[in-house]
Amino acid sequence: MVIASPSATFGLPEVARGLAANASGLPRLVRICGLQIASQIALTGQSVSAEEALKFNIANKVSKTQDSLVQEALEMAKLIASHSPDAVIVTRSGLREAWQQASVEQANRVTQDRYSKALYKGENAKIGLDAFADKRLPKWLPSNL
């Protein structure tokens, strides 16, 4: 996840230096924002602003001010940390697998095989479902995954 300050810029300047962005930047950029935008960024060597990065899905959010960036990032981190640690671990792994695998089915299979049984038999799954049914906030246990 990317939270950018209003003055941040994003780009692949390699082409302007006589190089190519071969450290996995090109395929990642194409997956994030599509071939047209990735081509513009990679072939021109020009940077895009934080607002453009947000529009192109390179950034998740632009902070209100330069000074509020850390606080806004911490707020997002606290929200994530408020959820079941088991669910966060498995969800993050699934996201990474989807990012790295060419096939949606393959990514799903790897995540399911690695975590499903432990996640759904774990105490945090029961805690979360019970809290939902009781309309209260869950009190998570440390992850055992």
Give, region by region, the residue ranges found by the protein language model.
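C-terminal long alpha-helix characteristic of the crotonase
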Residues: 3-8, 50, 59-107, 123, ...
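Short alpha-helical scaffolding segments that buttress acidic/His motifs in well-ordered protein cores
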Residues: 41-42, 91-94, 132
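Glycine- (often His-adjacent) and acidic-residue-rich active-site loop
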Residues: 16-18, 102, 118
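Short, well-ordered beta-strand elements within core beta-sheets of diverse protein domains
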Residues: 38, 42-43, 59-64, 117-120
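Acidic, divalent-metal-coordinating active-site segment for phosphoryl/phosphodiester hydrolysis
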Residues: 45-52
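Terminal low-complexity tails and localization/encapsulation signals of metabolic enzymes
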Residues: 129-145
